[in-house]
């Protein structure tokens, strides 16, 4: 996640706080995002030096979704009941434990799997609780809610990008490639935990007479026809594009980047994330509140990205691979902002006051895209005649099919419906 579409100013009551109080929470979010994405450029390393098959390694990329989705869906309502601190304090702990298990598990699929799940839990807590806490602290510190939202988004984005870049560089050129990158994250998480304990005041008092938790978890707007036919077709492409850009393409190019395959994977990751973040301001301008232009533009860019990825898989040249990763990153950013803006409008106009829950559902579906590398690796393992070029061509067709569904959904189910 690199952005938020919630531009509404929340009502945040309570005493004022230091203007810099939000930084402690932002560092915890940064450390969790770092821990979530540090593993990605190292996939090439585990393929080359570990005793794991391609399917197993790509499945590890997806496994942290097992931690993200439950914590994302549940921790938000829990933090509304019990406060932000009790739910956010464990995030850097989970991040550190996850990195520790990854550092110890270079040759153990079990330790790597558990470590990825712990990293996912930390990221889910940070996305659901950390973002709200940063916004509330920003408002109490004298900044606007929009500033708080930007700070939360930047904390996540910086963690994702810098974490991948530093981890890739350390694994490529520093000693102890299976350990050192994770030690950096453990240190960051420890510092973040201390700062949370001493410098981050609570902004949400525990609810005195809470209702049933199951009622808080209900999200009526998730059944809205526009959400089903316009938002869901684009959602898995968000991180499906990312996974293609910095998991599949670097793996295909590993033989052509023998001098620095891990650094090349990190470069693809950073390029994709940077392009995705940079394109989002354009995505806001393209989007129209009463239309479907943002989603249509995103799926069009994604189809182009799939075409370039097919060319990269066929040509196996570094320059085409980097271009494909960058365009796929643009598709990721466009799909993210278009989906979030649609979610905001659906929740606002439905009158059900479930924006946070609907946003969590959207993010949960976006993370399913990380399953794509494992699925494609499984296909190539069982059907050797099917190449990645063929599958990326199928991706073009799939993106255009999703575009057709979204256009149909827009015509049949207007935003205000």
What are these regions (language model features)?
Residues 59-76, 127-131, 270-282:
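Central cavity-lining transmembrane alpha-helices of secondary-active solute carriers
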Residues 69-107:
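Conserved MFS/SLC helix-loop-helix module at the cytosolic interface between two early adjacent transmembrane helices
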Residues 115-156:
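Cytoplasmic helix-loop-helix junction between adjacent transmembrane helices
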Residues 144, 151-197:
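Helix-loop-helix hairpin linking two adjacent transmembrane segments in secondary transporters
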Residues 179-197, 390-409:
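Symmetry-related core transmembrane helices of the 12-TM Major Facilitator Superfamily/SLC fold
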Residues 264-288, 298-305, 369:
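Transmembrane alpha-helices of Major Facilitator/SLC transporters
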Residues 291-337:
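C-terminal transmembrane helical hairpin of 12-TM major facilitator-type secondary transporters
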Residues 327, 332, 338-388, 394-398:
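A late C-terminal transmembrane helix in Major Facilitator Superfamily
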């Amino acid at each position: 996640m690199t952005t938020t579409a919630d531009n509404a100013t929340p009502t945040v009551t309570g005493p004022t706080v230091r203007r810099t109080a939000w930084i402690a929470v932002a560092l915890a979010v940064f450390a969790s995002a770092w821990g979530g994405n540090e593993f990605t450029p190292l996939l090439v390393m585990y393929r080359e030096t570990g005793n794991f098959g391609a399917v197993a390694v790509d499945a590890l990329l997806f496994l942290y979704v097992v931690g993200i989705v439950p914590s994302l869906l549940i921790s938000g309502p829990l933090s509304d009941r019990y406060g932000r601190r009790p739910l956010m304090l464990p995030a850097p702990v989970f991040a550190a434990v996850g990195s520790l298990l990854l550092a110890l598990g270079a040759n153990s699929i079990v330790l790597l799997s558990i470590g990825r799940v712990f990293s996912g839990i930390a990221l889910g807590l940070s996305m659901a609780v950390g973002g709200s806490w940063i916004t509330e602290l920003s408002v109490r510190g004298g900044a606007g809610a929009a500033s708080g939202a930007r700070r939360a988004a930047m904390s996540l984005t910086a963690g994702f990008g810098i974490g991948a870049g530093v981890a890739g560089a350390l694994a490529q050129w520093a000693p102890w490639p299976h350990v050192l990158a994770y030690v950096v994250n453990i240190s960051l998480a420890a510092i973040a935990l201390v700062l949370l304990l001493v410098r981050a005041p609570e902004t949400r008092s525990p609810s005195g007479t809470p209702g049933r938790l199951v009622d808080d978890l209900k999200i009526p707007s998730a059944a809205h026809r526009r959400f089903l036919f316009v938002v869901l077709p684009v959602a898995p492409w968000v991180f499906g594009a990312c996974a293609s850009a910095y998991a599949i393409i670097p793996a295909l190019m590993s033989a052509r980047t023998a001098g620095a395959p891990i650094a090349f994977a990190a470069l693809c990751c950073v390029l994709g994330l940077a392009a995705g973040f940079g394109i989002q301001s354009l995505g806001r301008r393209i989007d129209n509140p009463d239309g479907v232009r943002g989603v249509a533009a995103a799926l069009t860019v994604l189809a182009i990205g799939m075409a370039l990825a097919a060319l990269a898989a066929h040509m196996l040249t570094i320059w085409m691979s980097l271009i494909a990763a960058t365009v796929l990153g643009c598709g990721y950013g466009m799909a993210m902002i278009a989906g979030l803006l649609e979610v905001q409008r659906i929740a606002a106009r439905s009158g059900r006051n479930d924006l946070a829950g609907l946003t969590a559902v959207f993010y949960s579906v976006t993370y399913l895209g990380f399953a794509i590398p494992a699925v494609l690796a499984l296909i190539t393992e069982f059907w050797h005649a099917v190449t990645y070029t063929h599958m990326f061509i199928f991706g073009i067709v799939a993106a255009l099919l999703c575009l057709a569904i979204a256009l149909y959904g827009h015509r049949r189910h207007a935003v205000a419906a």
